């Protein structure tokens, strides 16, 4: 094998759509072994070995910003071709069916009324406010790594062992900053495809989806770029798949 090819660093496009601390994520993925380009250029996004989708703030605002740069189409095109995508924080939440937020004071939804925003629908589920006395859920927390046993119980093929958390101790903690999450996973039972591998965490009275592995599509509710050595290892695991 040509040594220049074998030593090539994977090229990651970090989608710049106005949401998220892109520089922090860029530096972390570079430390994980990839070359990172912050971009919204469609050709660059499609050409890259991997696409990183960050996101912070309100679900509705992130979806609006994503649509403004046709980011939803770019993500969909990559997934249709089996090309790797990693979503972080709200970048994970927008992959679900919808998000619900509650208006405060006056606004389109009215005081205290629920406002629904359609997501990308890659996974079934609704992003809702966590049930906890202290919000946001800010700080370090452990993750309950899934093993595919729920799929086996439904007569479906068990998911393969986690690649995302390979080499990471169960006691490791990751850094979360959020008030909303997906608290129910509606597992598909058609038996035709291997189900995603779902990982969970808890805060207050809520148990929520902390991360998902679904073929080329990975996502985390926590911030691996802010999660020390454990987060760096997770990013290295993703880069190794590119």
From Swiss-Prot:
Highest taxon of the source? Bacteria
How is this protein named in the record?
A: Imidazole glycerol phosphate synthase subunit HisH
Species this protein is from? Corynebacterium jeikeium (strain K411)
CDD domains recorded for this chain?
GATase1_IGP_Synthase
Q: Which gene encodes it?
A: hisH
Q: Which pathway features in its UniProt record?
A: Amino-acid biosynthesis; L-histidine biosynthesis; L-histidine from 5-phospho-alpha-D-ribose 1-diphosphate: step 5/9
Assembly state and interactors? Heterodimer of HisH and HisF.
Q: Where is the active site?
A: 89, 223, 225
Query: What GO biological process terms are annotated to this protein in UniProt?
Result: L-histidine biosynthetic process
Q: Which GO terms describe its cellular component?
A: cytoplasm
Q: What is the lineage of its organism?
A: Bacteria, Bacillati, Actinomycetota, Actinomycetes, Mycobacteriales
Q: What is its EC number?
A: 4.3.2.10, 3.5.1.2
* Record keywords: Amino-acid biosynthesis, Cytoplasm, Glutamine amidotransferase, Histidine biosynthesis, Hydrolase, Lyase
What compartments host this protein?
Cytoplasm
Q: Entry's Gene3D superfamilies?
A: 3.40.50.880
Q: What does this protein do?
A: IGPS catalyzes the conversion of PRFAR and glutamine to IGP, AICAR and glutamate. The HisH subunit catalyzes the hydrolysis of glutamine to glutamate and ammonia as part of the synthesis of IGP and AICAR. The resulting ammonia molecule is channeled to the active site of HisF.
